Amino acid sequence: MNSGFTHITVLLEEAVEALAVRADGCYLDGTFGRGGHSRLILSQLGPDGRLLGFDKDPQAIATGQALAAEDGRFVIVQRSFAELGSETQERGLAGKVSGILLDLGVSSPQLDDPERGFSFMNDGPLDMRMDPARGISAAEFIATAPAEEIARVFKEYGEERFAKRMANAVVARREVQPFERTADLAEVLKVANPAWEKGKNPATRAFQGLRIHVNNELGDLEAGLEAALDALEVGGRLVVISFHSLEDRIVKLFMRKLAKGEADNMPRNLPIQFKPFEPKIKIHGKAQFASDAETKANPRSRSAVMRVAEKLR
């Protein structure tokens, strides 16, 4: 494991405070990363408390295994949090978890390590997989997908305005030479993007789209939210930190639907009577953002949005 890359945990105190940790509770960290949130949770648990960590990244798993060797209250598994339903079932924890934390997106060590292939800033192999042993790499996707599919990924997941133009440039270039390096792809995307945003690399959105697609991030999020609700006990808390509008929209709509129902979207004078909506969760407060002090110390926290819900039934 390369220890030269550090990670500053975003909304550390705020997220753990939102969990309302009980000393004897059972908690789940769905995105262990480098263990910032997990360590703070463990510091608030008593001898009977338990914490289960999830991560797909082998470097995160190595860090988690070292922590598990130090603290018997902690266990880590190499799975996506989308699979927390089956994991909690297997461990007899379904409906018994006191709180679940999901800190979404890519970590600083993943972005900063060129060998992981996440960043256009540092040249490396074009991979982008959280778990390099599973699924296809970004290079494999770019090499085989039709232009229409590449454009869809750039537009739908990267919110890239010039997705079609950039995808066509990628396909034209791959017919001459395949893409193997991040800098190579970034250069082609840069040339194909006719309208650069001030202060933003023109490959940013396309790279985000690729990463989300390769790791099925939005699909995992939707599955993980549903599984989290089933895993929680009544009164248990769900805390989610997202880093871009696509993630936050999914979290916001999921919580709103379970807290308020869909009655507001129905016509007022329907000839049938609907059963009164019974909320499944209560939303705690408004969306929370990193403080000015935190964003100054850690610029990557600027886009963080935290939402909190409590299971009612």
Swiss-Prot record:
Pfam families cross-referenced by the UniProt entry: Methyltransf_5
Broad EC category: transferase
GO biological process: rRNA base methylation
SUPFAM superfamilies in UniProt: Putative methyltransferase TM0872, insert domain, S-adenosyl-L-methionine-dependent methyltransferases
Location, primary (coarse class): cytoplasm
Cellular compartments per GO CC: cytoplasm
Annotated positions binding S-adenosyl-L-methionine: G35, G36, H37, D55, F81, D103, Q110
InterPro entries per UniProt: RsmH, SAM-dep_MeTrfase_MraW_recog, SAM-dependent_MTases_sf
Source species, domain of life: Bacteria
Signal peptide: none
Keyword Phosphoprotein listed: no
Subcellular localization(s) per the UniProt record: Cytoplasm
GO molecular function, one term: rRNA (cytosine-N4-)-methyltransferase activity
Catalytic activity: cytidine(1402) in 16S rRNA + S-adenosyl-L-methionine = N(4)-methylcytidine(1402) in 16S rRNA + S-adenosyl-L-homocysteine + H(+)
Alphabetical UniProt keywords: Cytoplasm, Methyltransferase, rRNA processing, S-adenosyl-L-methionine, Transferase
EC number: 2.1.1.199
Family: Belongs to the methyltransferase superfamily. RsmH family.
Function: Specifically methylates the N4 position of cytidine in position 1402 (C1402) of 16S rRNA.
Name under which the protein is recorded: Ribosomal RNA small subunit methyltransferase H
Organism: Pseudomonas syringae pv. syringae (strain B728a)
Lineage summary: Bacteria, Pseudomonadati, Pseudomonadota, Gammaproteobacteria, Pseudomonadales
Gene this chain is encoded by: rsmH
